[in-house]
């Protein structure tokens, strides 16, 4: 039994591209710029006073073989989306709402720019508040899961 893997895009790049390509600047009040969205390894130092930041990074991955003999390999990758702003809690909440809206739209298949990859699904898992109130640095970290299915032959 050999496993044949499809050519999958990097899951972190897939999620950050989904956010970047579907971001609507008009949805965040008080700003006319997109936040600095990207993979953790692609972003250099960013001054939060100038721009909001959204970083994506992988935290876990699993493979589950479904079925006996020839079956499916279900690949699941957990991606963290780290949203940070210096403006305040209301802006942080706006960033979070826009990210959730984009992911829900991608899952429903009605986002303007869908996943465009071999990944079958993306879904939201959990959210953590990692704000540092003494530094006035407002953060949410949202975990999402991206899933692929590959044939085992």
Located regions from the model:
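Acidic-leaning, charged glycine-interspersed low-complexity segments
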Residues: 101-153
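Short amphipathic alpha-helices in soluble, non-transmembrane regions
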Residues: 95-101
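Conserved acidic
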Residues: 7, 91, 136
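Small/polar-rich, solvent-exposed N-terminal microdomains that initiate assembly or binding
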Residues: 1-69, 106, 110-116
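Oligomerization/assembly interface segments of phage tail-like spikes and tubes
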Residues: 71-88, 138-149
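Short, conserved charged micro-motifs
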Residues: 88-94
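A broad, low-specificity signal marking well-ordered, structured residues that form hydrophobic/aromatic
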Residues: 52-55, 79, 122, 142
């Amino acid at each position: 039994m050999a496993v044949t893997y499809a050519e999958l895009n990097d899951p972190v790049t897939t999620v950050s591209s989904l956010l970047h390509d579907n971001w609507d600047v008009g949805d965040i009040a008080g700003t006319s710029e997109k936040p600095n969205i990207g993979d953790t390894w692609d972003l250099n130092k960013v001054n939060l006073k100038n721009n909001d930041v959204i970083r994506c990074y992988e935290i876990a991955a699993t493979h589950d073989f479904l079925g006996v003999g020839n079956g499916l390999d279900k690949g699941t990758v957990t991606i963290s989306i780290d949203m940070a702003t210096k403006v305040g809690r209301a802006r942080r909440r706006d960033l979070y709402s826009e990210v959730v809206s984009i992911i829900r739209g991608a899952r429903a298949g009605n986002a303007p720019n869908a996943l465009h990859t071999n990944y079958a699904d993306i879904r939201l898992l959990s959210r953590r508040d990692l704000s540092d109130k003494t530094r006035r640095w407002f953060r949410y970290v949202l975990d999402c899961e991206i899933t692929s299915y590959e044939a085992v032959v």
